[in-house]
Curated annotation (Swiss-Prot):
Binds to the 50S ribosomal subunit and prevents its association with the 30S ribosomal subunit to form the 70S initiation complex. Keywords: Initiation factor, Protein biosynthesis. This is Translation initiation factor 6. It comes from Saccharolobus islandicus (strain M.14.25 / Kamchatka #1) (Sulfolobus islandicus). Coiled coil: none annotated. SUPFAM superfamilies: Pentein (SSF55909). Gene3D superfamilies: L-arginine/glycine Amidinotransferase, Chain A (3.75.10.10). GO terms for molecular function: ribosome binding; translation initiation factor activity. Belongs to the eIF-6 family. One of its GO terms (biological process) is cytosolic ribosome assembly. HAMAP family: eIF_6.
Amino acid sequence: MNLQRLSIFGTDNIGVYIYTNNKYTVVPRGLDSETKENIVQILGTELIEAEISRSFLLGIFISGNDNGILLPKSTIDDEFRFLKENLRDCRVEVLNSKVTALGNTILTNNKAALIYPEFNDIEEKIIKETLGVEEIRRGKIAQMITVGSVGVVTNKGGLVHVDTSEKELKELEKLFGVKIDIGTVNFGSVFIRSGLVANDKGTLVGASTTGPEILRIQKALGE
């Protein structure tokens, strides 16, 4: 697995700014050429520079997999049109929900999705249809309801909050169909998503992620 440490805009919280699947990586406008080249090299995707809600916090607002991409209702029309045109192989939908931090509230790979417990039935149906997943479930991870913020799952493996119980791990592995381990990023942060951006081809971690954390990440994501 390709893996590289990275900082963006002077912070190691790279997952706040970047969304990726196996086809596309969406990044903020204004990154330097070297950073963009590194991202493409590690993740092996087409790079798209964009905004959501006139913000660069793309990793917080966007959730998705290889089948579909979900955007918050705060997405502006021209932003939606731009992403719809450029994410050509993915279904792109706006989720009309009071919840806008979709990256923090939906954990998904191509098989399944674990979602924020307070999504309603209509929202759950739209999420399932857009992502094209076989199974969807509302729940928590280590008592945290923002399930997307405390885990990253690909089609090869997953890493979640260090306090996740053995029982929860088994349930998550059954749901997503991959091995899942516990860990931290950026020198002890339990908010996995903020410091880890991964697809089936490569992994980016925040620059302060330690050697032992990286070994755990590589093992968890199918190294």
